[in-house]
From Swiss-Prot:
HAMAP family: UPF0756
Pfam families named in the record: DUF441
Keyword Membrane on entry: yes
Origin organism lineage: Bacteria, Bacillati, Bacillota, Bacilli, Lactobacillales
Protein name, UniProt field: UPF0756 membrane protein LCA_1031
GO cellular component, one term: plasma membrane
Main location: membrane
Domain of life: Bacteria
Similarity-based family: Belongs to the UPF0756 family.
Membrane topology designation: Multi-pass membrane protein
Keywords assigned: Cell membrane, Membrane, Transmembrane, Transmembrane helix
Sequence intervals crossing the membrane: 4-24, 52-72, 85-105, 115-135
Length: 153
């Protein structure tokens, strides 16, 4: 019963904040939880969901390459600017930090509760999004802003 109330509270907060992603995610979890197969489905989503999400984001990121909007010329150009080097460095940093984070979660599963709560708070109240590769872009943006190197398009 507690999990239903917790999810309902998250849904209410998401609705009040008008956060479409969290509304959809919570609604999907509530529907899945109501299904007779939830005991089989939810653990699979818990174990594999982050990887599936990263895959979907990766596909979206690769589409400009597939459509020809980004090619080797743009890749080489990225390495000619401080912003490009910072972006590559942030990508590497996030990958390393993520590996350390996975290790921490394996050693301290109770951290998941704090991370989930913090993520919900950030998504709902600070208009953030729960994503991995996008974090690298956010860190890059922060560093570029500090050094006044934000590319203007």
């Amino acid at each position: 019963m507690e999990s239903w109330l917790f999810l309902a509270a998250i849904l209410i907060v998401a609705l009040l904040a008008k956060n479409q992603s969290l509304i959809i995610a919570t609604a999907v979890v509530l529907v899945l939880k109501a299904l007779p197969i939830s005991e089989k489905v939810l653990p699979v989503i818990q174990a594999k969901g982050i990887n599936w999400g990263v895959t979907v984001i990766s596909v979206a990121i690769l589409v400009p390459i597939a459509t020809g909007q980004i090619g080797f010329k743009e890749l080489i150009s990225a390495f000619k600017t401080p912003a490009g080097f910072i972006a590559v460095g942030c990508g590497v940093l996030v990958a390393v930090l993520s590996a350390k984070g996975v290790g921490l979660l394996a050693a301290s599963p109770e951290m998941t509760v704090a991370l989930v709560f913090g993520t919900i708070m950030g998504v709902v109240f600070l208009k953030g999004i729960a994503a991995g590769p996008v974090i690298a872009a956010g860190i890059t943006y922060t560093i570029l802003t500090i050094f006044n190197l934000v590319p203007i398009h």
